Curated annotation (Swiss-Prot):
Gene that specifies this protein: recN
Organism for this UniProt entry: Streptomyces coelicolor (strain ATCC BAA-471 / A3(2) / M145)
Protein name stated in the entry: DNA repair protein RecN
Molecular-function GO terms, alphabetical: ATP binding
GO CC annotation, single: bacterial nucleoid
Presence of keyword Nucleotide-binding: yes
GO biological process: DNA recombination; DNA repair; SOS response
Length: 572
């Protein structure tokens, strides 16, 4: 990794080799920045406070060896990244304003993409992870991870049934809690439908009545106009001397008929005049019929206006016209059917809920059985690891139990609480020595014991669910003496099959490393900065001496440091 302008680190290259690398340095020198840098490359949260004072941004670049056929390589290439000679190049930039950018294989990617790949690349463990192990849900997750497919299969089936049950319960609760609102809505719909049914409107009736009302309201004027028009076309019997349209057209017809044989063009015009005559007679006849049929009956007009008023009362409430009113009635009838079916739906949902609870109880039992079997193997494996970490008489076990809940699922004749991960409460217990009762690690484990339990769990995982790189950030806190030597020895064995990076303050642990990096702080009087360098030979002895006695030149400390290095070399 290359780190620039991150915290106290100005510009440093961290050369992480295969095997076991220990990162050491005085308190405040910036060892944690190495962990933070790797965290940023793995999609961790960015913070403007990480940027070195006076710098515009902090940059971390990393090169991670990845086999071309590895799942992480395939996923990276799907995102548009390219491998560089079997390695994946990752960079992360954090601005002084807190903005963050990520690049993967030369391509800009969302930070979430780095986090997606992280689990396949590096397992990071620090003191916060130790505290996390004190939580019951994390202990259950650890057991499920160890169990693998034996728990993953039943858990997937359980999770699907749980999802379906929650959906049914939510719908049932919604219908039940909204019963009053839905009843009020049904009453309003029923009232509206009854009101519309009482009027019995027909489609288009409002338009027809409007036209009829207009006609009846102007009946006298319409009749007079029709009579005048009829007289103009067909003549007025009371005025035999008057000239009408039909007479004039007939005269024109006779004049043309007398000579039409002499010119086809004139004959055609004569035909058209004949058509005009026919049209005039037809229109005149219809005008006469219109005038005769027109009824200026005031009773009919009153009835029409009354009907229109009834229709208007509906359009004021239910739609802009009768077509909209009828559409509202159709939709409301369908909605009313739905609302009136609530009781039936509640019965259906209740039956479905009970059936799903019964199914979930069976799946929860299968999950409990799988966890119980895996817990015995997991506890035995962790106990065996603790024996190699200077806790030869410690015993680890798991308590798997359920809590009574009348609203829960039935398992083995008991009704117990359940959740998205089953009905089990899983708790990790530790008996540190013979005769000691097994107690929850949250209550009975010291800091040093908790560190070793955490390491033992991780080592067991390395054998069942390995990743290429492990980073431990001072997980040896609270440990010293022989226990520290055993931790160093166990980490060295883990490094035979994976890359292991440890940030440590214990010389006994650092001595077992294949490579030791020193994070050191310098001050030129105005600016404080930290750098990282590889320790070799005499420099490494001096650093181990400082870690042992606080003095680099103490002969006793130097002798002890050389002895630690020799012991570690012999152990390899």
């Amino acid at each position: 990794m290359r780190i620039r302008s991150l915290g106290v680190i100005d510009d440093a290259v961290v050369e992480l080799s295969p095997g076991f690398t220990a990162v050491t340095g005085e308190t405040g020198a910036g060892k944690t920045m190495v962990v933070t840098s790797l965290g940023l490359l793995l999609g961790g949260r960015a913070d403007a406070a990480l940027v070195r004072i006076g710098a515009k941004n902090a940059v971390v670049e990393g090169r991670i060896a990845v086999p071309g056929d590895a799942a992480v390589a395939v996923r990276a290439e799907e995102a548009g990244a390219e491998l560089d000679d079997g390695a994946l190049l990752i960079s992360r930039t954090v601005s002084a304003e807190g903005r963050s950018r990520a690049h993967l294989g030369g391509r800009s990617v969302p930070v979430g993409m780095l986090a997606e790949l992280a689990d396949e690349l590096v397992a990071v463990h620090g003191q916060t992870d130790q505290q996390g192990l004190l939580k019951l849900n994390r202990q259950r997750q650890a057991l499920d991870r160890y169990a693998g497919d034996a728990v993953a299969g039943p858990l997937a089936k359980y999770a699907e049934a749980y999802r379906r049950l929650r959906a049914v319960v939510r719908e049932l609760e919604e219908i039940t809690t909204r019963a009053r609102e839905r009843a009020q809505e049904a009453d309003l719909l029923r009232y509206g439908l009854d009101e519309i049914a009482a009027v019995e409107p027909r489609a288009g009736e409002d338009v027809e009545l409007a036209e009829e009302a207009e006609r009846l309201g102007h009946a006298e004027a319409l009749a007079s106009a029709a009579t005048v028009a009829h007289a103009a076309l067909a003549g007025n019997p009371e005025d035999p001397e008057g000239v009408d349209g039909a007479t004039l057209v007939a005269g024109a017809q006779r004049a043309l008929d007398a000579v039409r044989s002499h010119d086809p063009a004139l004959a055609a015009l004569a035909e058209r005049i004949g058509e005009v005559g026919i049209l005039l007679r037809d229109v005149a006849g219809e005008l006469a019929g219109y005038a005769d049929d027109l009824d200026a009956d005031p009773l009919r007009l009153a009835a029409v206006e009354e009907r229109r008023a009834a229709l208007t009362a509906l359009t004021r409430k239910y739609g802009e016209d009768i077509a909209a009113v009828l559409s509202w009635a159709e939709q409301s009838a369908a909605r009313l059917t739905e609302l009136d079916g609530d009781d039936e739906r509640i019965g259906e949902l209740t039956a479905e809920r009970d059936a799903l609870r019964a199914e979930l109880g069976g799946l929860a039992q299968a999950l409990t059985d799988a966890r119980t079997e895996a817990a015995e193997r997991f506890a035995a494996a962790v106990t065996a690891e603790l024996a190699s970490l200077a806790m030869p008489h410690a015993r680890v076990s798991f308590a798997i139990r359920q809590t009574e809940d009348p609203e829960g699922v039935e398992i083995g004749g008991r009704t117990v609480a359940y959740g998205p991960s089953g009905a089990d409460e899983v708790e990790l217990l530790l008996a540190p020595h013979p005769g000691a009762p097994a107690r929850p690690i949250a209550k009975g484990a010291s800091g040093g014991e908790l560190s070793r339990v955490m390491l033992a769990v991780e080592v067991v995982f390395a054998g069942t669910d390995p990743v290429p790189t492990y980073l431990f950030d001072e997980v040896d806190a609270g440990v010293g003496g022989k226990a520290a030597v055993e931790i160093g020895r166990r980490l060295a064995r883990l490094a035979r099959s994976a890359q292991v990076v440890v940030v440590t303050h214990l010389p006994q642990v650092a001595a077992f490393a294949d490579r030791q990096l020193l994070v050191e702080k310098t001050n030129d009087g105005s600016v404080t900065r930290s750098g990282v360098k590889v320790l070799e030979g005499e420099e490494r002895v001096r650093e181990l001496s400082r870690m042992l006695a606080g003095q680099e030149d103490s002969e006793t400390a130097r002798a002890h440091a050389e002895e630690l290095l020799e012991t570690a070399r012999a152990d390899r």
